[in-house]
Amino acid sequence: MLKIMRISENQTPERLRGSRSKILRKIGRFGINISGWTIKGKIPDEERIVLIAAPHTSNWDFILAMLAIFGLNIKVRWLGKHSIFKPGFKKFFEWLGGIPVYRDNPSSLIENVVNIVKKEKSIVIAMTPEGTRKKVKRWKTGFLRIAKQTHSKILLISIDAPTKSIEIGKIFNPSGNSEEDLAYIQKYYSTFKGINPQKS
């Protein structure tokens, strides 16, 4: 019987691979394989990447994302709502690569991320531009500012529940006009449906 490989570390260029244990990498690949989801495409071989993932409509997105990060073995830091970094869980989520987002102080967050990126020769910063699982009309533009200040490429990652696939899409080069860039990106993602499509 032909074995279907839905995820492979070879989808990540060497300079963007993490230093996770073989066990964690196997857990990631096993989790994706038994879930029936597939990772399509490859992470581009760029020095610095700001990765945005959408549509974000379910708590399951986080679990799928962590399995994919482990399986692909990406060297990544991700932004998450500060409320999940509670005492007892804070160290765990930071170990997973998490950076808490305090929405009342966005400039401090951007400064923090910029400092993290500057310390690394190569790294991926991941975030969800909607900023919430709820349906929103206008996405946040922090990722555009972070990409500009860190001289990073923007990588579009889509979650498509009907096909059970996470698609590693194309690199987006900002024009400098945040409104036009955001409109283009939101239109790109409009063809994909999240796990809870009514929130897309």
Where are these regions (language model features)?
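Helix-enriched interaction subdomains in cytosolic or periplasmic regions
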Residues: 4-25
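Soluble catalytic domains of membrane acyltransferases
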Residues: 12, 17, 33-191, 199-200
